[in-house]
A protein has these predicted regions:
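Bacterial N-terminal signal peptides
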Residues: 29-34
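C-terminal motif of bacterial Sec signal peptides marking the signal peptidase cleavage site
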Residues: 37-38
Length: 241
């Protein structure tokens, strides 16, 4: 794949090691707790054939209610987890040991989130999606960091915008824990990207960062670019119960 970006790679920054240590501690506890108790029997129609993997061209219809919102989150977690797996499988030129460790931490968080939804939703969960990241040039540091920030920001906005539709307090608590991790991902990626000590806690992060929110109807078209199946979200709730 050709690289259409023609400029000199910047010198990678030295990322604050205390922040890296903090990042490593926030992911593990984020998905403990609630076990999707609001998922009704009527909702358990996402995967009637019990298949684990989808095929390109399939239409995957999300259900309504809490189960629909949780599967919507599962879509996003699949994208993020696979993205970081590919970042580490195809490290860009000049990736420092510190950056490698940060990406490993980010991957571990997202893989944990993906595994949580896969296990908790079980037969009511969507299949494993066929993902396409061909638009991202993984050998270019700037492309990788821009994509990482975009995925983290979309994830944060999606949880903030979709959480209000969850009717069970335990499900909402789990979503709240995960979105706090996503918001911290945004901050650490911004520090890597902009190479200064204010990017981690700039005004737009401290003041506005936790209040960025998007509806599923805004998020899924952005996510669809990376999914070879079609996600049908017509059943997702659009009003607060």
């Amino acid at each position: 794949m050709e690289n259409s970006t023609n400029f000199t790679q910047p010198t990678p920054p030295v990322v604050n090691t205390q922040r890296r240590s903090f990042l490593r501690t926030v992911g593990a506890a984020a998905v403990t707790g609630g076990l999707l108790t609001a998922c009704s029997t009527a909702d358990l129609q996402v995967r009637p054939d019990g298949a684990r993997a989808a095929a390109p061209g399939d239409v995957i219809t999300l259900p309504g209610g809490d189960l629909g919102i949780l599967n919507y989150a599962f879509v996003l977690e699949q994208i993020e987890a696979r993205f970081y797996e590919l970042v580490l499988a195809n490290p860009y030129e000049g990736m420092t040991a510190m950056e490698m460790q940060l990406f490993q931490d980010l991957r571990n968080h997202e893989v944990t989130h993906r595994a949580f939804y896969r296990t908790a939703l079980a037969g009511a969960g969507i299949p494993d999606l066929t993902l396409d990241f061909s638009s991202i040039y993984f050998r270019q540091r700037t492309d990788v960091l821009e994509a990482a920030r975009m995925f983290a920001e979309i994830g944060t906005a999606a949880y903030n915008g979709g959480g209000k539709y969850l009717t069970d307090p335990e499900n909402l608590a789990v979503a709240g824990k995960i979105v706090s991790v996503e918001a911290r991902h945004v901050s650490i990626i911004r520090e890597m990207q902009y190479m200064n000590q204010t990017a981690f806690s700039g005004d737009n992060i401290v003041i506005d960062g936790l209040f960025i929110k998007k509806e599923p109807s805004e998020v899924l078209p952005m996510a669809q670019k990376y999914i070879r199946e079609t996600i049908d979200a017509r059943n997702l709730p659009t009003t607060v119960a």
